[in-house]
Amino acid sequence: VEFTTPDKPEIKTEATVNGEKEVDPLEEVTIIDTVSYSGLVPGKPYKISGILMDKSTREKLLVDGKEVTAEVEFTPENATGSVEIPFTFNASTLAGKSIVVFETLYQEDVEVFVHADINDKSQTITIRGLGGLVIKKTAEDNFVEGISFLITGKDYSKKFKTDKNGEIRVEGLAPGEYTVTEISDKVTARYE
């Protein structure tokens, strides 16, 4: 009599955002976690639950005070295959953070495999940091204080005035293209 034992369930994963490992700190970001599995029993229901972790703190990532989780239920046709788990969240306050996806595979509510490696590069997404810029106004008569500039970009429009050195320093800008326009007002009217 021969006995065959089923393969032990395993999962391997790859997390990306539009195929990339880095993303801008946007209000809506969707990480797609592609979970490749093997050793599952065809025709049996499974569930994969995932949670996002903050790599620097090694704690569950909180966005607006809530954990970011997702789960997918599926019934495999074959012992091997893959499923995608989408995690959609607001990343606008997460600039500079690295996020790691952890998953747990369940069969009929019984945990059968856990993938929870905080250092797994295939599971890590980096939120790009914010940038800044410096504007330096020059003039032949050295009159550079109080000159107005408008900086505009995607979802951004703000007016600034130069300091006594003719400079404006702007921090906290999301990556992207910006337009800097000198504005004519009563201070700059002397140049017209």
Regions inferred by a protein language model and the residue ranges of each:
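Solvent-exposed loop/turn and edge beta-strand elements of beta-rich ligand-binding domains
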Residues: 1-192
